[in-house]
């Protein structure tokens, strides 16, 4: 809707009172609510097991919710699942493409699943490979790409449908800082071109470098949310505790603007 109607435009993502309880009895989400505005770069920050991937799975219709509502640009995922899914692209944490295909073929074949004509798909594939800094790898075997290149290929594939909302689940997990920064560059360019981006991460540095708004989730509950700078200022004063799966490392990482202190073997004071 336009501003002249007096009605605000729909949020890129609107989540209301979202619950998820698995068959095992585990409550992964406990009444999560949040809004992501069009054009935003938004982070879901939290430790492993906090509920980030479950939330993304529900939004992407890969996981069934127990209760609550989800809308993508005003389209309810229960009322019009296909319509909502056409508006978003998903980059999962796992590499899930054929390593024996060429990058261009991976993108073109993916576009075909969405009914995009081959001639148009070929043009888009070249555009997305260039944007992902993979133009010179279009005809290489995907298995020969570096780890960072493979992850950028996943982003290029998701962008083939021209989604208005791009969701990335732990896109830089397990990669070194140089690969991480190369991916940040690609994501900034995509966001600058108008695509709303949501990423899950447990790296505070990543959220701080990329995102304008942030929600901190722990044990299925949003514990803080709001503008990045305001939350960082608040955390400078208040701090927060993160429960970590498994023992903390002997040497804690250094994060600019934050002090990390081990409370016990599984709890980190930030």
Predicted regions and their residues:
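Conserved ABC transporter NBD signature motif
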Residues: 68-76, 83-84
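Conserved ABC ATPase "signature" region
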Residues: 108, 112, 119-137
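Conserved ABC ATPase signature
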Residues: 141-145
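Conserved catalytic motifs of ABC-family nucleotide-binding domains
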Residues: 162
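Catalytic Walker B motif of ABC-type/P-loop ATPase nucleotide-binding domains
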Residues: 166-169
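ABC transporter nucleotide-binding domain
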Residues: 184-270
């Amino acid at each position: 809707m336009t501003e002249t109607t007096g009605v605000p435009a729909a949020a890129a993502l609107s989540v209301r009172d979202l619950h998820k309880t698995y068959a095992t009895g585990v409550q992964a989400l406990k009444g999560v609510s949040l809004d992501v505005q069009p054009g935003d770069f938004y982070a879901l920050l939290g430790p492993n097991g906090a509920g980030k991937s479950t939330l993304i799975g529900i939004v992407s219709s890969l996981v069934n919710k127990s209760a609550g509502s989800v809308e993508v640009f005003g389209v309810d995922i229960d009322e019009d699942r296909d319509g909502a899914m056409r508006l978003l692209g998903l980059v999962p944490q796992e590499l899930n493409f054929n390593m024996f295909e060429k990058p261009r073929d991976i993108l073109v074949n993916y576009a075909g699943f969405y009914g995009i004509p081959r001639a148009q798909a070929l043009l888009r594939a070249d555009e997305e490979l260039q944007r992902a800094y993979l133009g010179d790898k279009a005809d290489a075997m995907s298995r020969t790409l570096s780890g960072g290149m493979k992850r950028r290929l996943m982003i290029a594939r998701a962008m083939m449908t021209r989604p208005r909302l791009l969701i990335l689940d732990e896109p830089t997990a397990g990669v070194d800082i140089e690969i991480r920064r190369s991916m940040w560059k690609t994501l900034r360019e995509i966001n600058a071109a108008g695509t709303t981006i949501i990423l899950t991460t447990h790296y505070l540095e990543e959220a701080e470098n990329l995102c304008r708004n942030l929600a901190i989730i722990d044990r299925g509950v949003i514990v803080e949310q709001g503008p990045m700078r305001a939350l960082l200022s608040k955390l400078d004063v208040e701090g927060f505790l993160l429960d970590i799966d498994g023992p903390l490392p002997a040497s804690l990482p250094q994060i600019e603007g934050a002090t990390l202190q081990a409370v016990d073997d599984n709890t980190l004071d930030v």
